[in-house]
């Protein structure tokens, strides 16, 4: 049996830099998307870069979702694979 794999990456622009540098809010966002998609979170990891920027990810039983931010540019990329 072969599983169908789906992957999507979304670029989000003109985002408030404070949000893009808030690890708790970004993890909450990932969890909300996971729940809305009826997926199942297993583990989370977050890395805060200096002086700014965050990479955060949730390992899902179906695969993963991640966000990478550049607050200085107001940009984030959200990637999900299931």
Predicted regions and their residues:
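Polybasic/polar functional segments that serve as interface/processing modules
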Residues: 1-82
